[in-house]
Amino acid sequence: MSKFSYLQNGKASTNGVPHANGHHQQHQNGHSNGVARNGGTATDTLPVAYQQKAATSGPFHMPRTEHVGYTYDTLQEIATYLLERTELRPKVGIICGSGLGTLAEQLTDVDSFDYETIPHFPVSTVAGHVGRLVFGYLAGVPVMCMQGRFHHYEGYPLAKCAMPVRVMHLIGCTHLIATNAAGGANPKYRVGDIMLIKDHINLMGFAGNNPLQGPNDERFGPRFFGMANTYDPKLNQQAKVIARQIGIENELREGVYTCLGGPNFETVAEVKMLSMLGVDAIGMSTVHEIITARHCGMTCFAFSLITNMCTMSYEEEEEHCHDSIVGVGKNREKTLGEFVSRIVKHIHYEAKK
């Protein structure tokens, strides 16, 4: 039997194994003008809804998969649930990375919601991620803060990992500040450095894994859109000014970030390859959140706290672990709190002009 999937006796199979998701993959070498190998049409064995879709749009325009994310109505329901329970109307959303959740603890006059109490919300399972959505004031500015995010390695599709960004958008946030803990792939970096993200390489997207896969809802944004200057250059420039003001300019970097699937750390060969591609920091988050935010038209600012140096030689002893990563974040909480507070203040000031 061919290694490619085709319809046989009404079932899609690959090497004799039915597809677990129940959807049928189609290939031109198995069909001619929409005719299946068994003599019927390519749509005969599909669910009725798919057959109806094919009848109006043709056999080669049938949905490939169901959307793995949330519908607009479901996300609107989440946003409404939250807005009915807080008087705050934030314009800035913040995502706290591993060990950086204490940023949310600097908010005042808070309304907080555990993820498990919010309808349709996933639950964070990683140490260092509290799993709480917090509304409050940071430097006198209303914000909403994710105290813990969702990762692909927890078993969530990327669309679900990035779902809270769309909720932020529906609540009224125009800006996203994303933070993460990352490994330094640039040998000039040091543990404790803050790297402003000027660009990213979407490696998971190279493999066809994107948070926007599936049907597009124009109410969020267009099907196709550009990603140049995704990380707002003006905010990055202002961040450098702020770093000088609070005396951390020597610890501030600017570079390229990439996201791997995790949960394992990178091999030496992988780090060498990514360094050759121009990657300065490696993590397991952020990229899909930023893509989703840009799709919604949000302005993005992001930075990585370098919590470990990637292992770049087989002679090195691999010392980094998740506990030490969380520890670095806690050691830098005061500095990062001041840094983010001033960024938020600047965003608020610029919006009032």
From Swiss-Prot:
Pfam families for this protein: PNP_UDP_1
EC class name: transferase
Pathway stated in the Swiss-Prot or TrEMBL entry: Purine metabolism; purine nucleoside salvage
Keywords of the record: Glycosyltransferase, Purine salvage, Transferase
A GO MF label: purine-nucleoside phosphorylase activity
GO cellular component: a single term: cytoplasm
GO biological process, one term: purine ribonucleoside salvage
Segments forming a coiled coil: none
InterPro entries for this protein: Nucleoside_phosphorylase_d (IPR000845), Nucleoside_phosphorylase_sf (IPR035994), Pur_Nuc_Pase_Ino/Guo-sp (IPR011270), Purine_phosphorylase (IPR011268)
EC number(s) given by UniProt: 2.4.2.1
Catalytic activity: inosine + phosphate = alpha-D-ribose 1-phosphate + hypoxanthine; guanosine + phosphate = alpha-D-ribose 1-phosphate + guanine; 2'-deoxyguanosine + phosphate = 2-deoxy-alpha-D-ribose 1-phosphate + guanine; 2'-deoxyinosine + phosphate = 2-deoxy-alpha-D-ribose 1-phosphate + hypoxanthine
Transferase is among the record's keywords: yes
Binding site for phosphate: 98, 129, 149-151, 181, 285
Region (Disordered): 1-42
Domain of life: Eukaryota
Stretches with biased composition (Polar residues): 1-16
Protein activity control: Inhibited by 5'-deaza-1'-aza-2c-deoxy-1'-(9-methylene) immucillin-H (DADMe-ImmH).
Binding site for a purine D-ribonucleoside: 266, 308
CDD domains: PNP-EcPNPII_like
Task performed by this protein: As part of the purine salvage pathway, catalyzes the phosphorolytic breakdown of the N-glycosidic bond in the beta-(deoxy)ribonucleoside molecules, with the formation of the corresponding free purine bases and pentose-1-phosphate. Preferentially acts on 2'-deoxyinosine and inosine, and to a lesser extent on 2'-deoxyguanosine and guanosine. Has no activity towards adenosine or 2'-deoxyadenosine.
Similarity remark: Belongs to the PNP/MTAP phosphorylase family.
Subunit architecture: Homotrimer.
Name this polypeptide is given: Purine nucleoside phosphorylase
Species of origin: Anopheles gambiae (African malaria mosquito)
Upper classification of the organism: Eukaryota, Metazoa, Ecdysozoa, Arthropoda, Hexapoda
Gene: pnp
